[in-house]
A protein has these predicted regions:
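Membrane-interface helix-loop-helix modules in multi-pass inner-membrane proteins
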Residues: 51-126, 132, 141-161, 223-267, ...
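Extended, hydrophobic alpha-helical segments in both membrane/secreted and soluble proteins
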Residues: 175, 182-192, 203-262, 275, ...
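Interfacial and helix-entry/exit segments of alpha-helical transmembrane bundles
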Residues: 39-48, 128-129, 203-225, 270-287, ...
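Soluble non-transmembrane domains of integral membrane proteins
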Residues: 518-610
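A conserved hydrophobic secondary-structure block that centers on an alpha-helix together
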Residues: 11-22, 28, 32, 95-227, ...
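Contiguous transmembrane helix-bundle modules in multi-pass membrane proteins
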Residues: 1-34, 50-52, 66-68, 244-254, ...
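Short, aromatic-rich amphipathic segments at membrane interfaces
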Residues: 86-87, 162-167, 591-623
Length: 650
């Protein structure tokens, strides 16, 4: 009975989404307040229906209702209950329902927290989000219904959740990543609503900016969690593989970063209006493209869902309608929102525009490297592979000027500035950056490489100018310590975001240039030295888990004769799915990780063991967290609410 109720609620939600996409929009066109006022209750009803339907699917997993085909294919009675809950979004149908649930959450949030906006603006925004929800609900109901029964025959037990997904990271990574993905629908809806109204001003940017910051924050955290999961779960010792589906989340992040900075210019200076609208359309379009890539069945990826071509065709139609319709509207009405605001080449506007162009160029590089192999294969031209060297080379070339502009930009004045005013800062920053970039690799790793110096120069340049920015703002009217307390959340958010970029680049630089990897055969008692650390293999013991059995390799690590860590690398056999998995052992620290992965037992009784020394690898994720915190600070800045109150009072 519960699955049938879930089906009914999805049908009801589709009906509400259709009403939400029609009535408020019609009311806004006719200035009928009665029709526009329907937007908020319809949005709340949509959220309630999808929310309850999702809880019913979770309930089916928790109680092991194997009459539901999706549950039987992705769960098992021996699966721990928390993984049963995570299995709800572990495959195509459930993850798509999660996608729509989070879309309804964003729709509900806009309905609740936009009460100071004009009613016609809210009506248009919610109507656009209703259209998106309606399209995806149709997709679920016709091709991907998670409530489909397997009657009259159904299995006594389920196939089990993919062992790769039986990890604590998979409980949090997909929902947070999807919150970012779907969150850009709000920026998209604001952009389309503004085009429909023919009005795009600083108020539009101020309304849209906190929602964009929230979406960007969630997407940043989702990417960080996914990278960390790949690092410790896949057993390869890497944190980013330029996998097509990883790229599908990275592209909207790049465009979203450009959008955040462009919104700042539109809000404060009234310029970049048409460009900002185009970025909002592009960010959400890339989110839809990522959804298509994951579910089309055309990609080989550890992240891709096994899917039939009809599903990919349905999403492709949605993609064409959404992108084509929005670009057509932009072509028809984009000219009306353009604004001419004069500024010189040496101005903050020019620096932000330059960084926007570099971010879009980086996105196009990733898009080309992701889609070209797929297009090449579909055209019958054979298989080609675009790998890490291409992406790394192109990104380094683009990110060097990006870091240059990112560091200096916040210290440049709006509209125009004097180059001579910055000469002293430029000389100091250049000398400190160059000195530290040469000294740190030698002090920490005993050798210097050209790529390490380039990477550290990029990071330290951004970091030094971020500190200069804090000092200048704090001492503008007060003493330094008193001035720190006067900085706004938005200013702290910008500094945290830029420092986060620097910290991430430091982590990438050291881990890419100074990591050490060894693949060895080891018997109990064998040892090997890796970068000042002595690894001793103490054999393998049997272990048993809730739904798996396996072996645990014990590796003692010492440094200068003193115990440093004991690594317990596992090899697990999942009985339900009959799959063997590797669980890496990691001893983490602020400046280094020691990493071990247990391979197969060899014929002579020895074991294949992979050992890594990875310096500063965690800084990659620390920087991502700092960036997300920066987004949170900006999002919570009360100045937006204060401005609205002042406008209303006047």
């Amino acid at each position: 009975m519960m699955p049938e109720l879930g089906n009914f609620l999805l049908c009801l939600a589709a009906g509400l989404a259709l009403l939400l996409s029609v009535y408020p929009l019609w009311g806004a066109a006719r200035q009928d307040r009665r029709l526009m006022a329907l937007a908020r209750p319809l949005a709340c009803g949509l959220f309630a229906c999808i929310g309850v339907a999702f809880l019913l699917l979770v309930h089916a997993f928790v109680v092991n209702d194997f009459t539901v085909r999706y549950v039987a294919e992705n769960s098992n009675s021996a699966l721990p209950v928390w993984y049963r809950v995570a299995a709800t979004w572990g495959a195509h149908e459930g993850s798509l329902l999660l996608w729509v649930l989070l879309l309804s959450v964003w729709t509900f949030a806009v309905a609740i927290f936009s009460r100071r906006m004009p009613l016609d603006a809210v009506a248009r925004v919610l109507a656009v989000m209703g259209m998106i929800a309606f399209g995806f609900l149709l997709f679920i109901l016709f091709t991907s219904n998670p409530f489909s029964r397997g009657l009259p025959q159904y299995p006594i037990d389920g196939r089990d959740l993919n062992p790769l997904l039986q990890d604590i990271g998979m409980i949090f990574h997909p929902p947070i990543l999807y919150m970012g993905y779907v969150g850009f629908s709000v920026a998209f809806a604001f952009a389309i609503a503004s085009l429909l109204a023919g009005r795009l001003d600083t108020a539009w940017a101020r309304w849209s900016r906190p929602w964009t910051q929230a979406a960007w924050m969630f997407l940043t955290l989702g990417i960080v969690l996914g990278s960390a999961w790949a690092y410790y779960e896949l057993g390869w010792g890497g944190w980013w593989f330029w996998d097509p589906v990883e790229n599908a989340s990275f592209m909207p992040w790049l465009v979203g970063t450009a959008l955040l900075h462009s919104l700042a210019v539109t809000e404060k200076r009234g310029s970049f209006r048409a460009w900002t609208v185009l970025l909002a359309i592009a960010a959400f379009s890339l989110c839809l493209l990522g959804t298509f890539l994951v579910r089309s069945g055309g990609l080989v990826s550890v992240h891709a869902f096994a899917s039939d071509p009809s599903r990919g065709l349905f999403i492709l139609v949605l993609l064409i309608v959404a992108i084509g319709g929005s670009l057509l509207l932009y072509a028809l009405k984009g000219g009306r929102v353009r604004a001419r605001v004069e500024h010189t080449l040496w101005s903050r506007e020019s620096f932000l525009l330059g960084n926007n162009i570099l971010l879009m160029a980086a996105m196009l590089v990733v898009l080309l490297g992701t889609l070209l192999p797929l297009v090449h294969k579909e055209l019958g031209l054979g298989s080609i592979s675009i790998g890490e060297p291409f992406f790394n080379t192109m990104f380094t070339a683009l990110m060097a000027p990006f870091a240059l502009l990112l560091g200096l930009g916040p210290l440049i004045r709006w509209r125009r500035d004097d180059v001579a005013r910055q000469i002293k800062r430029l000389i100091i920053a250049l000398l400190v950056t160059l000195s530290l970039s040469l000294a740190l690799p030698w002090l920490l790793q005993d050798r210097i490489t050209a790529m390490a110096v380039i990477g550290l120069m990029m990071a330290l340049w951004v970091l030094i100018f971020a500190l200069m920015e804090v000092h200048e703002r704090a001492t503008h009217r007060h003493g330094f310590w008193r001035g720190l307390r006067t900085l706004t959340r938005s200013q702290w958010g910008m500094v945290l975001g830029h420092v986060g970029v620097a910290v991430t680049v430091i982590g990438i630089t050291f881990s890419q240039n100074y990591s050490v990897e060894r693949d060895v055969r080891m018997r109990p008692g064998d040892s090997i030295d890796i970068h000042r650390y002595h690894f001793v293999f103490n054999g393998v013991r049997n272990i048993v888990g809730p739904n798996w059995t396996g072996g645990e390799g014990i590796i003692a690590v010492t440094r200068n004769g003193r115990p440093e860590a004991t690594l317990y690398a596992e090899k697990r056999f999942y009985t339900a799915s009959r799959m063997m998995m590797t669980e890496a052992a990691i001893s983490g620290g602020l400046t280094r990780d020691l990493y071990a992965a247990l391979g197969e037992e060899l014929s002579d009784g020895s074991w294949a063991v992979r050992l890594y020394y990875k310096p500063f690898v965690r800084w990659i994720w620390y920087g991502g967290v700092l960036m997300a915190l920066g987004g949170l600070c900006c999002m919570l800045d009360p100045r937006y609410r204060m401005r609205k109150k002042l406008q209303e009072a006047s």
